[in-house]
């Protein structure tokens, strides 16, 4: 049986731990233990302060096999173990293959295919970063129509994809449009488990999401999170 342990850290930060590797996405703050007995892959979707903390480069101490997969808007010193990716790129690291999608805000979203020693099947993980359906009433009709098109176009890459674990924004600041991004995503992919993120500490929005009539077809696949 595949060992895959998903841990919510804070905001949009998650770790996904396998027997033979660990992935970390958009670490901002919170408790995390970096293992020394397996490779660690650290993903950063863009440079916004709530998705990127330079502390991640301090994890690179002796004995840790670590690689950084960074959006190319991040100003990081070049190093052999740092890979910068723009939107719509593909990167093959052997047992990990990464596709990037163009964000509707800054940077990229990540679609990661993983070959672990425990499973003949690839494991697929999607982390949206700030790729979301950002509908702001105050921005007006033209902006919001463009946002809708940009979001739906970006997700065409994911159409029908089987995804084991997805991390998708559910932002309470969007008011009644808070669920539009996750709803479109879930209706256009074959995702087994989706974790809400980017909630700014307002975790009760998840209860609203679970009661939202539109989420009925996939409600049992939504995994509620709480900051540790």
Regions found by a protein language model. Give the residues of each.
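Core dinuclear metal-dependent hydrolase active-site scaffold
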Residues: 2-37, 81-162, 225-228
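Short, hydrophobic beta-strand segments that form beta-sheet elements in well-ordered domains
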Residues: 5-8, 22-26, 42-44, 64-73, ...
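Binuclear metal-ion centers of metallo-dependent hydrolases, dominated by the metallo-beta-lactamase
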Residues: 6-12, 79-93, 178-228
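Active-site environment of divalent metal-dependent phosphoester hydrolases
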Residues: 30-33, 48-52, 74-78, 89-91, ...
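Active-site metal-binding motif and surrounding structural segment of the metallo-beta-lactamase
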Residues: 29-75, 156-167
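A short, acidic, amphipathic alpha-helical segment used as a generic capping/interface helix at domain edges
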Residues: 150-156, 175-184
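Short amphipathic alpha-helical segments
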Residues: 36-37, 54-57, 81, 139-140, ...
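Short catalytic-loop micro-motif centered on adjacent basic/acidic residues
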Residues: 43, 98-100, 166-169, 194-196
């Amino acid at each position: 049986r595949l060992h895959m342990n998903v841990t919510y850290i804070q905001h949009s930060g998650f770790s996904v731990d396998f027997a033979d590797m660990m992935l970390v996405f958009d670490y901002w703050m919170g408790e995390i233990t970096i293992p020394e007995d397996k490779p660690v892959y650290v993903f950063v979707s863009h440079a916004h302060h709530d998705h990127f903390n330079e502390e991640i480069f301090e994890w690179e101490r002796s004995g840790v096999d670590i690689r950084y997969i960074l959006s190319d808007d991040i100003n990081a010193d070049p190093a052999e173990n740092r890979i910068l990716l723009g939107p719509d790129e593909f990167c093959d690291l052997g047992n990990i293959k990464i596709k990037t999608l163009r964000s509707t805000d800054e940077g990229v979203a990540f679609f990661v295919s993983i070959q672990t020693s425990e499973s003949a099947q690839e494991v697929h993980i999607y982390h949206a970063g700030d790729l979301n359906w950002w509908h702001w009433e105050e921005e007006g009709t033209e902006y919001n129509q463009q946002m809708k098109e940009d979001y739906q176009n970006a997700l065409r890459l994911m159409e029908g994809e089987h995804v084991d674990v997805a991390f998708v924004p559910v932002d309470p600041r969007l008011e009644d449009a808070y669920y539009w991004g996750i709803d479109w995503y879930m209706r256009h992919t074959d995702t087994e488990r989706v974790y809400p993120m980017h909630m700014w500490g307002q975790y009760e929005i998840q209860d609203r999401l679970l009661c939202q009539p539109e989420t009925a077809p996939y409600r049992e696949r939504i995994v509620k999170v709480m900051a540790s």
